[in-house]
Amino acid sequence: MKIFFAILLILAVCSMAIWTVNGTPFEVRCATDADCSRKCPGNPPCRNGFCACT
């Protein structure tokens, strides 16, 4: 049972980390579209100096 809860906790932490990266509540600065392709999934465009991550 302890192993099950440990796995659940690891999955919860990983999913929160993935949500933070994909959802990016933080503004991601960029100079070109290539910068965004490295910082955000899905190759979003660079608009007004920030990546359009969704």
Curated annotation (Swiss-Prot):
It is found in: Secreted. GO terms for molecular function: potassium channel regulator activity; toxin activity. Contains 3 disulfide bridges. InterPro entries: Scorpion_toxin-like_sf. Expressed by the venom gland. Residues 1-23 form the signal peptide. Coiled coil: none annotated. Keywords: Disulfide bond, Ion channel impairing toxin, Neurotoxin, Potassium channel impairing toxin, Secreted, Signal, Toxin. SUPFAM superfamilies: Scorpion toxin-like (SSF57095). Its main location: secreted. The keyword Secreted applies. The keyword Signal applies. One of its GO terms (cellular component) is extracellular region. Has the structural arrangement of an alpha-helix connected to antiparallel beta-sheets by disulfide bonds (CS-alpha/beta). Belongs to the short scorpion toxin superfamily. Potassium channel inhibitor family. Alpha-KTx 14 subfamily. Potential blocker of potassium channels. This is Potassium channel toxin alpha-KTx 14.3.
